[in-house]
Each structure stands twice: as structure tokens, then as C-alpha cells.
Amino acid sequence: MREAFICDGIRTPIGRYGGALSGVRADDLAAIPLRELLVRNPRLDAECIDDVILGCANQAGEDNRNVARMATLLAGLPQSVSGTTINRLCGSGLDALGFAARAIKAGDGDLLIAGGVESMSRAPFVMGKATSAFSRQAEMFDTTIGWRFVNPLMAQQFGTDSMPETAENVAELLKISREDQDSFALRSQQRTAKAQSSGILAEEIVPVVLKNKKGVVTEIQHDEHLRPETTLEQLRGLKAPFRANGVITAGNASGVNDGAAALIIASEQMAAAQGLTPRARIVAMATAGVEPRLMGLGPVPATRRVLERAGLSIHDMDVIELNEAFAAQALGVLRELGLPDDAPHVNPNGGAIALGHPLGMSGARLALAASHELHRRNGRYALCTMCIGVGQGIAMILERV
């Protein structure tokens, strides 16, 4: 069987909501790592790229009408290189890698770029058309995150719990305490801060160069969402606004962020022809559905499914990158999979609670981080897994090359 390999990857820093990257359109943001991949790999013939596949969860504003194609052109790739945008909400970036890997395994391509982008700062307000003449029922939605234009049957049959409310549901179901969640969040901040100060995160990042109207140039080099001075006392003091006697706070949840990532996926033969060095083999990927109100547990069945496909167990994984949408759901996943809350090989360099969660980009970031960490640890297998809004999970296994 033909195999698909991650040969290189890069990402932008992750910006805070309204922060350093908020002035950058999503298509321009996605073009940055695409362009950098060509710079980093001068022997790569861009004419040989079969497709560019990017995940993006919003697509309601400047990221509309196939942002992958827009970014491909803006990055200076040949017009002959096609691009497509996929949407599996939070799992979009990881799903993009899966699409690329399947294309190679099926013989439908040899060289692809896959990744994701999200500019949550620039997500627009949207309003639907009137359903009748002179209607006064117009409703406006903030597209940054959450439900919009809800189907009444969906609301009736499955509810429309917000993302924090789904985390509350998981915490209540599995009896995950506020104390355990805050401790998990603190570890995320501490591990991320250590990874940033040691230069580990910098290995993944291409700086973003910005110029203001006065011509002043600023270079954004580092992720800006993390709070390295966070203490347990500070986390304990935050209010839980989503439910009476709730446990979900701004401190034990991921952020609303901006960022983009791109990875080169190639067959073994094409990698050799293009002077690329395979770093990780994409072994298998799986998705699974769960009850929408418990969407945070989606990684559990997805992980079990991908492990079965690969003929492996959770204990074969040397690195696990689990997206931290909320501490409650991350802990729920760990406990359901039989892993300790503070497993050192799970998010060893922190996670989304500290780094942030630009929806369409996050899955690609997980795969990039996992491929780097496998080489640092001389490990063999890595698992990347995420929960997905409306009740899904996605999981991918990588093998170090």
C-alpha cells in the first residue's frame, strides 16, 4: 500500500482575540505558512503540488468562498495548484491531513499541502434574509463561535447547549471537580510557558510581519494567549458564569483565537524526488459521533476506533496531543481512556487552554506538535485527538520516521 508522510510543517503564532493578528484577514493569514513551506524547501517544485486542503470552521466572512484557494494564490503558488476548504468545525485542520493522506494512499495524488486557518477576531455578524415581505423578525448572529441559524427540529430533538454548557454536562456526568479542572488548567499553562521559554514552540512558528499605516514594522514571533504567571489561587477565584453552581470558567477553558498552519504531505517516492525528508507516517484516522450535549467526549470513541484500525493500544502511544477545549472534557477523555490526569506524555508542551484554540487551525497544530515531539523523545507512535461541536470526535495516529 502507498503511504503518506508528513515531511514538513509550520504555523503562525497564535493570537489572542482582538490581539496582534486581529488585523490580518484569514486568507492572508493562511498564505503565510503556505509561503514559508516553499521558502523552507527550495528544491520543492510547486508545480507538482496536487492540491492544498485547509480546514476552516467559520467561513462566514473574509474566509468565505473557499479560503484555501484564495490563500494558495496569495501565497504565490502557481495558478495550476488547486485548493479546497473543508469544515468539520474544531476538527477541520486534522481532517484536512486525513483527506491528504487518503488521496495519496488511493493514488489520487503524491504531494499535497494540508492545514487549517481561523481568524476568530474577524468573524462577522450575520443576518438572514427576511422570510416574508416587511418582516420584523430579523435576527443577527455573532459568528465567532457557537450556534447560528438553528434548525427548530435540531433544537427540539438535540438541544442547543453552548460549548461551555456541554463541558458542564461532561463535568456533571463524570463528576469532574472544579479543583481537578483548575489543576489541569494550571499544568497546561506551566507546560506551555516552559515550552515557550525553552524554544520548543519556536521550532513550529514562522513569525508574522506586520506594517501599520505609518510604515512601522512589527514582527509577531510568539504565541500571545498564554498566561505564564497563572496561579491556582487565581483560577479558583474565577466565576463560573454558565450555570448555577457551575465549574467552567475562562481559566479552565480554551481561548478564542487567530492562527494558521500548513504541513507538506507526500508519498515516499515524491518526497525523495522533491528533496523532502519524511518525519512521520500517517498511520490511520477515524471519526465518531456522540450525543451533541456531550460533544467533549467525542475523542473517546474516535480514539478507540483509530487504535483498532491501527492494531494498537493506547499504551503504545509515546505522545498524545489532546485538544484542550475545556479542562472538564479533556479530563473526561483521559479518564475514559484509562490515563492519569497528569500523564507526562499527554500535551507535554501544554495545550489549548494556554495556547488558544483557533478552530480550523488547531488540528493541524496538534499534528505538527506531535511530529516534533516524537523526534525529541525518540518515540514511535503519537495520537492526535479532538472533540468537535455538535457531537463528534476525530483521532489520528502518527509514526515517527
Swiss-Prot record:
User: Which SUPFAM superfamilies does this one have?
Assistant: Thiolase-like (SSF53901)
Q: Which UniProt keywords apply?
A: Acyltransferase, Transferase
Which Pfam family is one of those matched by this entry?
A: Thiolase_C
> Recorded E.C. number(s)?
2.3.1.174
Q: Which CDD domains match?
A: thiolase
Which residues carry out catalysis?
90, 357, 387
GO terms, molecular function: 3-oxoadipyl-CoA thiolase activity
Its UniProt entry gives the catalysed reaction(s) as: succinyl-CoA + acetyl-CoA = 3-oxoadipyl-CoA + CoA
Pathway(s) annotated for this protein in UniProt: Aromatic compound metabolism; phenylacetate degradation
Q: For this chain's UniProt record, which GO biological process terms are given? A: 3,4-dihydroxybenzoate catabolic process; phenylacetate catabolic process
User: What's the family?
Assistant: Belongs to the thiolase-like superfamily. Thiolase family.
Purpose: Catalyzes thiolytic cleavage of beta-ketoadipyl-CoA to succinyl-CoA and acetyl-CoA.
Please give the name of this protein: Beta-ketoadipyl-CoA thiolase
Which species expresses this protein natively? Escherichia coli
